[in-house]
Amino acid sequence: MAGKFEIYKDKSNKFRFRLKAGNGEVIAVGEAYESKAGCLSGIESVRKNAPDAAVVEV
């Protein structure tokens, strides 16, 4: 099963997303957004910028 992004509202009624692996484990969580459109933009940013992201120890 492929991973998926889930959009939900938090306790403050803000939109957030979480990325779940194929096994259902949450592997990433986005910040709070005022609008669903902003949340969707955050998801698109992750999709665009992360496919070949380097792993860097800081």
Swiss-Prot record:
InterPro entries: DUF1508, UPF0339_domain, YegP-like_sf. SUPFAM superfamilies: YegP-like (SSF160113). Signal peptide: none annotated. PANTHER family: PTHR40606, UPF0339 PROTEIN YEGP (PTHR40606:SF1). Belongs to the UPF0339 family. This is UPF0339 protein TDE_0826.
